[in-house]
């Protein structure tokens, strides 16, 4: 797959194109230019490190939405075995913006639930761009309650712009569905591990992100509203999105300082989409450790810790 570069990555894109051209020349001729290719590759890596070491919140927001980032189904394929997808909410329909089912993690049975976006236009429409309707959240809850019934740990992956705000979704009880999930997650009697892998958009993300451990990938975001939405409300123009991103504190490092996130999972150079394999290794290492810890804690203590975490939400600072 040809890499897609964001606006602020254009200097990297230019170097990458030069490297590709030189590789083509080397393949088509007897001239040895491997030293020049190596020099440009090192220059590209150094430039990438420099750019990504000082990303603004607005730029991190762009990375979190990168069209080539790994999605929930990519994590399921890489981290789990024997995945059996479960469908429907048993009330209205099957929402493809939420995927989930039974799987094995290191041989242990678990329930996996997550948002799913699409790669191409057809798939994006089918998945509703990763924005669940009420039936999606009710499906997620059905799966999590099934996990509770059989004593299976729950692992969730969060990547959504937010819950779908359409009229039909509101008529079918969007806010009730999200609220019900939040209520049930506070007392679900199994370990719950949550990982934000891309966008963590408002209540649409929170509805599957209340757990004993909450992780974020290094270049993911988590906020009550998108920077563009915030800018449109406060400044009446989306052009102020960069200012909104700064004020909202949407980045993993910022949220960890506020004790809203347990672990920030390091991403490969250039973002998770540049090296799926390394990303999966990093995520798996964290989930293995946390699952072991969660299962060693008495259930009553686990639930008490989870409740205390939720009650601590809403702190604010005037700084």
UniProtKB/Swiss-Prot annotation:
GO BP term (any one): fatty acid biosynthetic process
Pathway annotation: Lipid metabolism; malonyl-CoA biosynthesis; malonyl-CoA from acetyl-CoA: step 1/1
Catalytic activities: N(6)-carboxybiotinyl-L-lysyl-[protein] + acetyl-CoA = N(6)-biotinyl-L-lysyl-[protein] + malonyl-CoA
Catalytic activity, EC: 2.1.3.15
Pfam families referenced in this protein's UniProt entry, alphabetically: ACCA
Primary localization class, coarse: cytoplasm
Disulfide pairings: none
Keywords from the UniProt entry: ATP-binding, Cytoplasm, Fatty acid biosynthesis, Fatty acid metabolism, Lipid biosynthesis, Lipid metabolism, Nucleotide-binding, Transferase
Subcellular localization(s) per the UniProt record: Cytoplasm
Domain CoA carboxyltransferase C-terminal intervals: 39-293
PANTHER family assigned: ACETYL-COENZYME A CARBOXYLASE CARBOXYL TRANSFERASE SUBUNIT ALPHA, ACETYL-COENZYME A CARBOXYLASE CARBOXYL TRANSFERASE SUBUNIT ALPHA, CHLOROPLASTIC
Self-association state and partner proteins as the record states: Acetyl-CoA carboxylase is a heterohexamer composed of biotin carboxyl carrier protein (AccB), biotin carboxylase (AccC) and two subunits each of ACCase subunit alpha (AccA) and ACCase subunit beta (AccD).
Family note: Belongs to the AccA family.
Role according to the record: Component of the acetyl coenzyme A carboxylase (ACC) complex. First, biotin carboxylase catalyzes the carboxylation of biotin on its carrier protein (BCCP) and then the CO(2) group is transferred by the carboxyltransferase to acetyl-CoA to form malonyl-CoA.
Protein name, UniProt field: Acetyl-coenzyme A carboxylase carboxyl transferase subunit alpha
Organism of this sequence: Neisseria meningitidis serogroup B (strain ATCC BAA-335 / MC58)
Lineage: Bacteria, Pseudomonadati, Pseudomonadota, Betaproteobacteria, Neisseriales
């Amino acid at each position: 797959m040809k890499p897609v570069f964001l606006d602020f990555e254009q200097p990297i894109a230019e170097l990458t194109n030069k490297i590709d051209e030189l590789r083509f020349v080397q393949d088509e001729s007897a001239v040895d230019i491997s030293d020049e290719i190596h020099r440009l590759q090192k220059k590209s890596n150094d430039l990438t490190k420099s750019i990504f070491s000082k990303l603004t919140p607005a730029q991190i927001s762009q990375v979190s939405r990168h069209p080539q980032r790994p999605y929930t189904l990519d994590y399921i394929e890489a981290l789990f075995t024997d995945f059996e997808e479960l469908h429907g909410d048993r009330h209205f329909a099957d929402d493809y913006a939420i995927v989930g089912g039974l799987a094995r993690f290191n041989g242990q049975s678990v329930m996996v639930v997550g948002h799913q976006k699409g790669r191409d236009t057809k798939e994006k429409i089918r998945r509703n761009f990763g924005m669940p309707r009420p039936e999606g959240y009710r499906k997620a809850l059905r799966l999590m309650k099934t996990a509770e019934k059989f004593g299976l740990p729950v692992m969730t992956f969060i990547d959504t712009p937010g819950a779908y705000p359409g009229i039909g979704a509101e008529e079918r009880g969007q806010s009730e569905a999200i609220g019900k999930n939040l209520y049930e997650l506070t007392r679900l009697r199994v370990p719950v591990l949550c990982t934000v892998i891309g966008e963590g958009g408002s209540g649409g993300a929170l509805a599957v992100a209340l757990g004993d451990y909450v992780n974020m990938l290094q270049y993911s975001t988590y906020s009550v509203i998108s920077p563009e939405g915030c800018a449109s409300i406060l400044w009446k123009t989306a052009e102020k999105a960069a200012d909104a991103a700064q004020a909202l504190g949407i980045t993993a490092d910022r949220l960890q300082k506020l004790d809203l996130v347990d672990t920030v999972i390091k991403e490969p150079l250039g973002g998770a989409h540049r090296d799926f394999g390394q990303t999966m290794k990093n995520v798996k290492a964290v989930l293995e450790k946390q699952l072991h810890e969660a299962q060693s804690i008495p259930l009553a203590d686990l639930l008490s810790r989870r409740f205390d975490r939720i009650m601590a939400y809403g702190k604010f600072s005037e700084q």
